């Protein structure tokens, strides 16, 4: 009992570190819109290895927050601790230039345990999105000189979830038909800072003064998602699995703090001079971001202890939705971004390990996955063209059993390509490692 309490205290202590870890990420100009760029579900190495397949997946030594029904697969009298780490190496490129960057972070932390034989619960935290970019545009001005326009942003949004999974049919017996349902209560929290700085370098500074437009956004919202999973044995060798998730649409309110001002730089330090906005001294106002109704569907077919093939589809109609500033003053002016329908398709294949084999290599599971995502962002640029930002990727992973197969170590390597070289493309190599530990924590020991 004391060990369980210490583990849960550790989870909550590490929760506070996640937002700060997400604020030193890879330079990504794509993250300047909305609440930033999201890497879900690829921040979870076990999911990334299968191309992002998550909706039909469940295991006794894994926490799958992307379908809360999966918590029902947690065995009685056990506690599951799941943690993942990721390292990214990314290159931004267009037709003429390229830039390399690298970063590492905690992908997620989660625990799951039974409340009764049919009711299981999970607690966890993971980053949802990240804002991390800096770029400079230099242009000439008259009379003589130039102006540097610096775009920069930092921050991120994290998700703390409390999930519940219920065994409706079959319990955790793999020889029986199983039906599970569940839901997550998700608390989104975080802060985002975006700024545009105009740095004038002119022969005559009488007509020019450095200025900055800055907006801090604070996110605190609660959202819900629902899930179901169904597993059906087919004969003695095969098994069909299906999963579905629903995330209801929601208008998320955020608090913005905006400031537009001029400044002077002396001896390397900045000093504010004149405030352009707000004129009345109140820089805070509420804004809103609409989240669409999102549907996830997954199917998997397995030959017991041999192989598994799985497919996922995610549908999010972002088209028509927008980020609404409830202010009479537009801090950054008209955005060139437009939201489009978002579709993500994932396909994965596994060679399953034989848990009874005497050779360790044969007990290992090997995964291969790929995904394609029709992005929700579409840029409308001054050349009159629309650029939709799509993504595709491929990944490979290996799962190595520990402690007689009850716990597992997952190692994943993957590649993704996002955007287009005609505008800007990000090529990323990702390496992930996660540990899923399943321990007997609720058994009363008997002593003679």
Language-model features and meaning:
Residues 17-19:
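N-terminal signal peptide c-region/cleavage motif recognized by signal peptidases
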Residues 23-448:
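Subset of outer-membrane beta-barrel
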Residues 1-8:
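Bacterial N-terminal signal peptides that target proteins for export
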């Amino acid at each position: 009992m004391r060990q369980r309490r210490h583990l849960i205290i550790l989870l909550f202590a590490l929760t506070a570190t996640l937002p700060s870890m997400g604020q030193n990420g890879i330079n990504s100009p794509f993250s300047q819109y909305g609440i930033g760029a999201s890497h879900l579900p690829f921040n979870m190495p076990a999911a990334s290895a299968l191309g992002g397949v998550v909706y039909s997946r469940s295991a006794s030594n894994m926490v799958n927050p992307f379908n809360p029904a999966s918590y029902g697969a947690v065995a009685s009298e056990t506690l599951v601790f799941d943690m993942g780490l990721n390292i990214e190496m990314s290159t931004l490129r267009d037709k003429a230039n390229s830039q390399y960057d690298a970063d590492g972070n905690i992908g997620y932390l989660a625990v799951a345990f039974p409340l009764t034989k049919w009711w299981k619960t999970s607690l966890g935290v993971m980053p949802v999105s990240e804002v991390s970019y800096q770029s400079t545009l230099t242009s000439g001005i008259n009379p003589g000189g130039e102006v540097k326009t610096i775009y920069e942003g930092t921050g991120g949004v994290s998700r703390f979830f409390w999930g519940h999974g219920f065994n409706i049919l079959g319990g955790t017996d793999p020889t029986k038909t199983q039906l599970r349902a569940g839901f997550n209560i998700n608390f989104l929290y975080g802060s985002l800072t975006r700024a545009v700085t105009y740095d004038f370098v002119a022969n005559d500074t009488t007509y020019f003064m450095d200025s900055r437009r800055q907006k801090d956004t604070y996110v605190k919202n609660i959202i819900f998602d629902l899930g179901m999973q169904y597993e059906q044995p087919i004969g003695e060798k095969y098994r069909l699995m299906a999963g579905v998730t629903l995330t209801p649409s929601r208008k998320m309110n955020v608090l913005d703090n905006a400031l537009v001002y001029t400044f002077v730089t002396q001896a390397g330090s900045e000093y504010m001079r004149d405030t352009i906005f707000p004129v009345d001294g109140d820089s805070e106002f509420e804004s809103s971001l609409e989240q669409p109704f999102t549907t996830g569907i997954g199917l998997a077919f397995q030959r017991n202890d041999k192989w598994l093939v799985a497919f996922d589809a995610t549908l999010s109609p972002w088209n028509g939705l927008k980020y609404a500033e409830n202010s009479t003053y537009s801090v950054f002016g008209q955005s060139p971004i437009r939201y489009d329908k978002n579709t993500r398709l994932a396909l994965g294949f596994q060679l399953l390990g034989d848990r009874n084999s005497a050779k360790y290599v044969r007990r290992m599971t090997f995964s291969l996955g790929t995904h394609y995502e029709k992005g929700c962002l579409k840029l409308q640029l001054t050349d009159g063209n629309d650029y939709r930002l799509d993504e595709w990727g491929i990944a490979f992973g290996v799962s190595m059993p520990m402690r007689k197969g009850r716990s597992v170590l997952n190692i994943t390597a993957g590649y993704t390509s996002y955007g287009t070289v005609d505008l800007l493309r990000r090529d990323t190599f990702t390496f992930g490692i996660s540990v899923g530990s399943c321990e007997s924590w609720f058994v009363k020991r008997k002593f003679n």
